[in-house]
Amino acid sequence: MQCSPRFANRPSTSEATAVPELPEVQAHAERLTAQFTGRELAKFHPFTFTALKTAVPRPEVAYGLPLERVGRRGKYLKLQFEPVTFVVHLMQGGRLLVDEKQSPKPRNGQARFVFTDGPALLLTEAGTERRAGVWCIANDAIDGPPLDRLGPDALDVTPEALAASFATTNMRIHGYLRDQHQIAGLGRMLANEVCHRAKISPFAMTGKLGAEGAAAVVAAIHAAVDEGLAYERTRSDMSSSADRPGRVHGRVGDPCPVCGDTIRSVSYSGYTVAYCPTCQTGGKVLADNTTSRFLK
């Protein structure tokens, strides 16, 4: 599907700086695995005192050992060595970049992985919040913090498990999809896209969706993630979700590619939800406040 040429100009600042989602992180893990597997770690250098989130084990235990692969769990990258794994969360403004220059004071530098030869990997973070960071975790404790807080990975969720979860929660589906405790890897864009593909109002309550709704959501997750991954794998670097093509996200005012109705948005809890009235809400336009009877 081709996006409107206006697509790139539509997202708000907050949307453009959203935390990278599963497609961006997975494709970047694949790129880094291809480029850095087998490279021996010489040094891990944090540039700020907040960059390294753990005290033990020390990063030095991986020095001289080859990188086995770069994996992913939810929105986290995992640099896997034999004794430890470096878990990296990019937050909103972070990137893990191939670092050819290895400047002593890199702009927005948070931490650097230096290898015995070739380029380094540089964790950067734009802005002032400085929330991106690295956890050095023993491999036998990899299921502990911070990954223990995550729900099942988005691509591993089954219709049966999701229906069971829906039955025990009473959340708006858009918020449920973005809650990393419920499903790991989705964010604002994918929540918009999944709701549209599943033909579900973004404010439908999970407790009312049932098995049929759960099956529709799982199918929509796979379709939206597969489309995002296909796009990300054409790139040589990590995009932001604002760059990635979608059906409704960032396309407010455009015609819906499914039915032709105008894509609309509603502000909710500080972010923008995009939806198609015909496909998702029975033609009803959601009021731009949380007290609307259509949001209940």
Place the predicted regions along the sequence by residue.
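Phosphate/anion-contacting hairpin/loop surfaces
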Residues: 15, 82, 86-197
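Surface-exposed binding/hinge segments that line
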Residues: 15-131
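N-terminal polybasic/positive-inside topogenic patches
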Residues: 10-11
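Generic detection of long, well-ordered alpha-helical segments
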Residues: 19-22, 26, 156, 210-218
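Basic, nucleic-acid-binding surfaces and adjacent catalytic neighborhoods in DNA/RNA-processing proteins
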Residues: 40-61, 71, 163-296
